[in-house]
């Protein structure tokens, strides 16, 4: 791929050669990385996840060029001295390393291929990293379009939630050309503690979809277990403590418990506000369903989880965190 032989970081007259691997400890690698770090990085999508991710790039000394469809969310960055663009195309015109964090496949297609999209102004050799969770087939199509422009596309969806985004402890699942992984890793390590190369474009999305399907199933299971225990006379904090020292322990029980009052600093203790929305979980489960259909893979619990989250969206839970499944099971009595 011609794009893998391009230079990055030229915006300020500093060059970053991305087409040749170097030993991590070599002076050339250290100097190259240091120079590249002084060049602007584009960031598009400043929602619940994108906002803290962008802030962690700032903390690591990266100047940012930002865009969001809602201009108000850019104000605090502008006040901090960062550049705010009027469109994704303007971001691409000013930065040759761009990270996107968007809600859906449709949003990603618009940001990359729309009338004022990245591809209208993208420079040869640019590195485009999409951290949205979208259909793997859409990632592959975007990669083809980006390659035609002489640039490089990598999918790098994340896991860990808003808390990990704030603390810089996200897990990134990266798909794309392996020779470009080190260039992406440099940026992603500023926002995450785990950056894993998964394979070709689309494999990062596949890994994320599998993870979120399991997350939804485990959250429903945790909510059901907690609800059953509470109705059987157990104190919720005591039950959570027992689960978390037993074989039923999982992230949904020990880090993101869905029962109000059991844990501090989680959406369940804030009327299920913030966090990862029910609509987004339903979307991701739909992606898992599509992937299962195309690969002829049975996902019995995944399909049931998809039905439950779709029902929640229709019952007024769409804007609440996905852990509100506890409230849904407790109050709606769906079965």
UniProtKB/Swiss-Prot annotation:
<feature type="active site">
    <location>
        <position position="208"/>
    </location>
</feature>
<feature type="binding site">
    <location>
        <position position="283"/>
    </location>
    <ligand>
        <name>NAD(+)</name>
    </ligand>
</feature>
<keyword id="KW-0520">NAD</keyword>
<keyword id="KW-0809">Transit peptide</keyword>
<feature type="transit peptide" description="Mitochondrion">
    <location>
        <begin position="1"/>
        <end position="35"/>
    </location>
</feature>
<feature type="modified residue" description="N6-succinyllysine; alternate">
    <location>
        <position position="148"/>
    </location>
</feature>
<feature type="modified residue" description="N6-succinyllysine; alternate">
    <location>
        <position position="78"/>
    </location>
</feature>
<dbReference type="InterPro" id="IPR006115">
    <property type="entry name" value="6PGDH_NADP-bd"/>
</dbReference>
<feature type="modified residue" description="N6-acetyllysine; alternate">
    <location>
        <position position="237"/>
    </location>
</feature>
<feature type="binding site">
    <location>
        <begin position="39"/>
        <end position="68"/>
    </location>
    <ligand>
        <name>NAD(+)</name>
    </ligand>
</feature>
<dbReference type="GO" id="GO:0008442">
    <property type="term" value="F:3-hydroxyisobutyrate dehydrogenase activity"/>
</dbReference>
<dbReference type="InterPro" id="IPR002204">
    <property type="entry name" value="3-OH-isobutyrate_DH-rel_CS"/>
</dbReference>
<keyword id="KW-0007">Acetylation</keyword>
<feature type="binding site">
    <location>
        <begin position="102"/>
        <end position="103"/>
    </location>
    <ligand>
        <name>NAD(+)</name>
    </ligand>
</feature>
<dbReference type="GO" id="GO:0050661">
    <property type="term" value="F:NADP binding"/>
</dbReference>
<dbReference type="InterPro" id="IPR013328">
    <property type="entry name" value="6PGD_dom2"/>
</dbReference>
<feature type="modified residue" description="N6-acetyllysine; alternate">
    <location>
        <position position="148"/>
    </location>
</feature>
<feature type="modified residue" description="N6-acetyllysine; alternate">
    <location>
        <position position="241"/>
    </location>
</feature>
<dbReference type="Pfam" id="PF14833">
    <property type="entry name" value="NAD_binding_11"/>
</dbReference>
<feature type="modified residue" description="N6-acetyllysine; alternate">
    <location>
        <position position="75"/>
    </location>
</feature>
<dbReference type="InterPro" id="IPR015815">
    <property type="entry name" value="HIBADH-related"/>
</dbReference>
<comment type="pathway">
    <text>Amino-acid degradation; L-valine degradation.</text>
</comment>
<feature type="modified residue" description="N6-succinyllysine; alternate">
    <location>
        <position position="320"/>
    </location>
</feature>
<dbReference type="GO" id="GO:0051287">
    <property type="term" value="F:NAD binding"/>
</dbReference>
<comment type="subunit">
    <text>Homodimer.</text>
</comment>
<feature type="modified residue" description="N6-succinyllysine; alternate">
    <location>
        <position position="241"/>
    </location>
</feature>
<feature type="modified residue" description="N6-succinyllysine; alternate">
    <location>
        <position position="59"/>
    </location>
</feature>
<feature type="modified residue" description="N6-succinyllysine">
    <location>
        <position position="140"/>
    </location>
</feature>
<keyword id="KW-0496">Mitochondrion</keyword>
<keyword id="KW-0560">Oxidoreductase</keyword>
<feature type="modified residue" description="N6-succinyllysine; alternate">
    <location>
        <position position="75"/>
    </location>
</feature>
<feature type="modified residue" description="N6-acetyllysine; alternate">
    <location>
        <position position="59"/>
    </location>
</feature>
<dbReference type="InterPro" id="IPR011548">
    <property type="entry name" value="HIBADH"/>
</dbReference>
<protein>
    <recommendedName>
        <fullName>3-hydroxyisobutyrate dehydrogenase, mitochondrial</fullName>
        <ecNumber>1.1.1.31</ecNumber>
    </recommendedName>
</protein>
<feature type="modified residue" description="N6-acetyllysine">
    <location>
        <position position="120"/>
    </location>
</feature>
<feature type="modified residue" description="N6-succinyllysine; alternate">
    <location>
        <position position="237"/>
    </location>
</feature>
<feature type="modified residue" description="N6-acetyllysine; alternate">
    <location>
        <position position="320"/>
    </location>
</feature>
<dbReference type="GO" id="GO:0006574">
    <property type="term" value="P:valine catabolic process"/>
</dbReference>
<keyword id="KW-0101">Branched-chain amino acid catabolism</keyword>
<comment type="similarity">
    <text>Belongs to the HIBADH-related family. 3-hydroxyisobutyrate dehydrogenase subfamily.</text>
</comment>
<feature type="binding site">
    <location>
        <position position="133"/>
    </location>
    <ligand>
        <name>NAD(+)</name>
    </ligand>
</feature>
<dbReference type="Pfam" id="PF03446">
    <property type="entry name" value="NAD_binding_2"/>
</dbReference>
């Amino acid at each position: 791929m011609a794009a893998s032989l391009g230079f990055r970081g030229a915006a300020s007259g500093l060059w970053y050669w991305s087409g040749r691997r170097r030993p991590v400890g070599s002076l050339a690698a250290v100097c190259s990385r240091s120079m590249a770090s002084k060049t602007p990085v584009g960031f598009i999508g400043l929602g619940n996840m994108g906002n803290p991710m962008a802030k962690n790039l700032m903390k690591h000394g990266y100047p940012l060029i930002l865009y969001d469809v809602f201009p108000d969310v850019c104000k605090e960055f502008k006040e901090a001295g960062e550049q705010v663009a009027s469109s994704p195309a303007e971001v691409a015109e000013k930065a040759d390393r761009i990270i996107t964090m968007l809600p859906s496949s449709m949003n990603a297609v618009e940001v990359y291929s729309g009338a004022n999209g990245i591809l209208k102004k993208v420079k040869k050799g640019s590195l485009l990293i999409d951290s949205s969770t979208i259909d793997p087939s859409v990632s592959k199509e975007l990669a083809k379009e980006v390659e035609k422009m002489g640039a490089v596309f990598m999918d790098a969806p994340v896991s860990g939630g808003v808390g990990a985004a704030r603390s810089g402890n996200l897990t990134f699942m990266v798909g794309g050309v392996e020779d470009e992984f080190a260039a992406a890793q440099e940026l992603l390590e500023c926002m995450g503690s785990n950056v894993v190369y998964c394979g070709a474009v689309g494999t990062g999305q596949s890994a994320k979809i599998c993870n979120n399907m399991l997350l939804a199933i485990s959250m429903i299971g945790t909510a059901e277990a907690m609800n059953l225990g509470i109705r059987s006379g157990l104190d919720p904090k005591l039950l959570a403590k027992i689960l978390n020292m037993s074989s039923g322990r999982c992230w949904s029980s020990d880090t993101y418990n869905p029962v109000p009052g059991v844990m501090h600093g989680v959406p369940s203790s804030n009327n299920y506000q913030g966090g990862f929305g029910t609509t987004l979980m339903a979307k991701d489960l739909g992606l898992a369903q599509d992937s299962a259909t195309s690969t002829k893979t049975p996902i019995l619990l995944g399909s049931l989880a998809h039905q439950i989250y779709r029902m929640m969206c229709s019952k007024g839970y769409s804007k609440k965190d996905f852990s509100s499944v506890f409230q849904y099971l407790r109050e709606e009595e769906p079965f």
